[in-house]
Structures are given as structure tokens and as C-alpha cells.
Amino acid sequence: MRVVLAGTGSAVGKTTIATGIMKALSGRGVQPFKVGPDYIDPSYHTMATGNTSRNIDSFFMTEAQIREAFTRAMKLSGSRMGIIEGVRGLYEGISPIGDTGSTASVAKALDAPVVLIINSRSLVKSAAAMVLGFRSLDREVKIEGVILNQVKNRRHYLKTRRAVEELTGTAVIGGIPRSSELEVEQRHLGLVPAVERDTIAAQIEKWGLAMEEYIDLEALQDIMSSAGKIRGERQPLWQRGNRKRVRIGVAIDEAFNFYYQENIEALEDNAASVVPFSPIHDEELPDVDAVYIGGGYPEIFAAELESNTSMRKSIQRFHADGRPIFGECGGLMYLMSSIDEREMCGVFPHPAEMTGRVQGLSYVIAEAVMDNLITEAGDKFRGHEFHYSRVLGASGGKFAFRVLRGRGIVDSLDGITSGSSLASYIHIHAASCPQFAANFTRNAWEF
């Protein structure tokens, strides 16, 4: 059983509705997924279902890897239902006419039915026109149901449902009323991560109750049941190359929590024991062979990170001893000398500063120009970048990556290196950089 919950565009209520549906059906076994590279929406899914949400992305993955990622996650969680939240509009991708990076591409790779979410504010018959347009653009995308969001009242809902069903033949399975309780707080990188929200569990509970009230969940399950067995080739997500036991310290707390679960599992599949630690709360690094500091919001917690002098000194000593550290985006910022003049680790002698506008927002293609912690010279890999910060004075640094698509740190270069350490604005996924875990764990052993 599987379904894609797609929108006609951004800000139509996908995350609230998808998370609410996941919560409402969680007792029946739901494995959540998110199309695209986003870290934050999946944190809501995970809290709603108790199962770790997985990202599926046709820029990061081949169709065969999409099928592998889906079936693998379903098997690991033992879930009956796979619910996939789309990204932006159903057909938005990296090209104005292509499929790559779109929700539609994932639906087709998985042969999954689609339920289209429409912001129906001030719409009646025009909602039917939207459904017809979305259905006719690509007949391989199976739009089997519609959810109307932002319904004014029951009369509005009934009129719009009639228009859609009679003019398009597509079932309307729910109408969600306008309500401030069905909104999610925003931040400069998107929604506020669930890890930061003390009240998020109660909020998700409300969303689940709302979906139980306003959506025909039995009809939704019938749509999910219409999906046949997934057919087609499957392909491994990452390389397996290291069999020597290593310990990898992974920074996980309020400031650093942007990790793809597959990255952690790829490390474990390459003989790593993952040891979580907190740059905010712990006094020093645990006993590990290498350190992985992912993305997050270090700029929001810069005061707390600066005040933990013992942890910063522990990281400085670890680096000075020649042991490897890998920092991604927020992790890169923490490894710099400062963030907005607040002292950080100083692994790299450059300050990071927040700006008032996006400095990088793109899918990325990069090529390694030298052997480094996670890739070898000549390797090409993919990822994404989304940040408002920039690194100052880094133009004379030593860089491991040439950025072929995207911006990087400076002058289309990324992956700044110092000793055994590497820091990059590029967020990688185990499938988009399949050599990542094998190289990282091997280098952790050798260093």
C-alpha cells in the first residue's frame, strides 16, 4: 500500500495534511517518506509515526535506487502503508520541461497513486480545471484523489467537490477548513525542526484529529491499495568497502540535526559504530576515530556553542592530532573561527557570517579534484546546498571539490580541507555520493 500526497504548488498545506494523515493512520503501520532533499518535514513525519522518515529524490537517485530506498525502508519498519509527501508542485523539478527532481518522477518510479492537494480558497469550478490540467499533463501520473484545503465552510466544500467530481471524474476525499491551528511555524531554511518544538507533539496530535474528521481515510486506504507490486530493477544505495571497525562521533542536538538516515546506516554498513554527542551539552568529544558534524542551525545556538569552551577545545585537539572531521553546512560553520563574531572551533581560520539573503540554494554536482576524506580524485557526486551564510577570506584555501552545478564556498570551489578534516556547504546523501561511507570509514581507520 502506498500513496503520494502531492500539491499544486508550495504552501498549499502538504506538510500539515501529510503529517496529520500519517498521525491518524500511525496505529496501522505507516512508513513516511519525503520527496526532495528537505530535512525538516521528515522530522514531523518521524514524530507522527514513530518511524524514521526517508527522503526519496530523483536527482540524488536513479529510478532503481528509488525503488530500493522505498522497499528497503518499508521492510526495515515493517509497515503496511508507505505515505510519501511531495515537494513543491507535483511537476516541479530542476528543468521546466523535465522530470528530474519532481514528485511526479517519484510517483512514476514507484507506480504509486497520487492524491492532489489544492488550496481551494476562492475556487469552485476552477478547482476542476486545475485537476484536469494536472491529470492531462502526464498520463503516466495516476491522480486518483483530491483533497481540498482552505475550505471556507461546508457549502463551499460541497460545491467545489461537486465541480471536481462531476467535471473530472476524480474523487474528492476530503476538505480541510481554514484554521490557524493547521499551520506550521517557518524559519529561513523552511519549517522549524520538530526537535526544537516542545509543543510539536500536541500540535501533530491536533493535525491527526483534524484529518480523521475531515478526510475519508477509508477512501484514502482504498487508493493506497490500488497500487500493485513494485516492479523494475533495484540498485544498491551505497558502496560497501570497509570492514575494519571504527567509531564515528556524530553531532546531534538542537544545533545539529540535519542528517539523512541512510548516511548513518551507510556508515554502520561499513563497520562503523555511530556515537552521538552534543556540541552544546557535552564537555568533550567521546572516544572516537572520526567526527561527523551535519547541518542545522548553529547560528541560532551560536551563544551556547561559544560558551561550551571545553567542547571547542576538544575538537581543536582532535584536529591537531591529525584525526578526521567532516562538517556539512552548519557543521562547516561551526568548524570556522567564528559565526557572526562568536568564537567557534577554529579548525579553519576563516569567519562565517549570516547574511540577509540566500547565498546558495541549488542541487549540486561536484567533482573531487584531490583525494579527501569522503571521495577520491575524479569522483563525481551530487548533493544540495541551502544556506544564508558565507565564509570570508577563504579564496586562498585548499579545496577538494570543483562545483559543476551550484555555488560552493567561493569561486565554484567547495570542500575546504585542513589536515585530515573536510568541510563543505554541500549536503550529500548516501545514494548521491555512494562512495561517502566506504571512504570515510576507511580513512577514519587509517588516520
UniProtKB/Swiss-Prot annotation:
Q: Which cofactor does the UniProt annotation name?
A: Mg(2+)
Quote the InterPro entries the UniProt record gives. Answer: CbiA/CobB_synth, Class_I_gatase-like, CobQ/CobB/MinD/ParA_Nub-bd_dom, GATase_3, P-loop_NTPase
Q: Where is the active site?
A: 329
Under Pfam families, the record lists: CbiA, GATase_3
Q: Which GO molecular-function terms appear in the entry?
A: ATP binding; cobyrinic acid a,c-diamide synthase activity
Q: Which pathway does the record list?
A: Cofactor biosynthesis; adenosylcobalamin biosynthesis; cob(II)yrinate a,c-diamide from sirohydrochlorin (anaerobic route): step 10/10
Q: Which PROSITE patterns match?
A: GATASE_COBBQ (PS51274)
Q: Does the keyword Protein biosynthesis apply?
A: no
Q: What keywords are annotated for this sequence in UniProt? A: ATP-binding, Cobalamin biosynthesis, Glutamine amidotransferase, Ligase, Magnesium, Methanogenesis, Nucleotide-binding
Where does the record place the GATase cobBQ-type domain?
247-435
What's its catalytic activity? cob(II)yrinate + 2 L-glutamine + 2 ATP + 2 H2O = cob(II)yrinate a,c diamide + 2 L-glutamate + 2 ADP + 2 phosphate + 2 H(+); Ni-sirohydrochlorin + 2 L-glutamine + 2 ATP + 2 H2O = Ni-sirohydrochlorin a,c-diamide + 2 L-glutamate + 2 ADP + 2 phosphate + 2 H(+)
From the UniProt record, give one GO term of the biological process aspect.
methanogenesis
Taxonomic superkingdom: Archaea
**EC number(s) on file:** 6.3.5.11, 6.3.5.12
Q: Where is this site: Increases nucleophilicity of active site Cys?
A: 427
Additional note from the record = The a and c carboxylates of cobyrinate and Ni-sirohydrochlorin are activated for nucleophilic attack via formation of a phosphorylated intermediate by ATP. CbiA catalyzes first the amidation of the c-carboxylate, and then that of the a-carboxylate.
| Domains (record comment) | Comprises of two domains. The C-terminal domain contains the binding site for glutamine and catalyzes the hydrolysis of this substrate to glutamate and ammonia. The N-terminal domain is anticipated to bind ATP, and cobyrinate or Ni-sirohydrochlorin, and catalyzes the ultimate synthesis of the diamide product. The ammonia produced via the glutaminase domain is probably translocated to the adjacent domain via a molecular tunnel, where it reacts with an activated intermediate.
Membership in a protein family: Belongs to the CobB/CbiA family.
Cited function: Catalyzes the ATP-dependent amidation of the two carboxylate groups at positions a and c of cobyrinate, using either L-glutamine or ammonia as the nitrogen source. Involved in the biosynthesis of the unique nickel-containing tetrapyrrole coenzyme F430, the prosthetic group of methyl-coenzyme M reductase (MCR), which plays a key role in methanogenesis and anaerobic methane oxidation. Catalyzes the ATP-dependent amidation of the two carboxylate groups at positions a and c of Ni-sirohydrochlorin, using L-glutamine or ammonia as the nitrogen source.
Name of this chain's protein:
Cobyrinate a,c-diamide synthase
Q: Which organism is it from?
A: Methanothermobacter thermautotrophicus (strain ATCC 29096 / DSM 1053 / JCM 10044 / NBRC 100330 / Delta H)
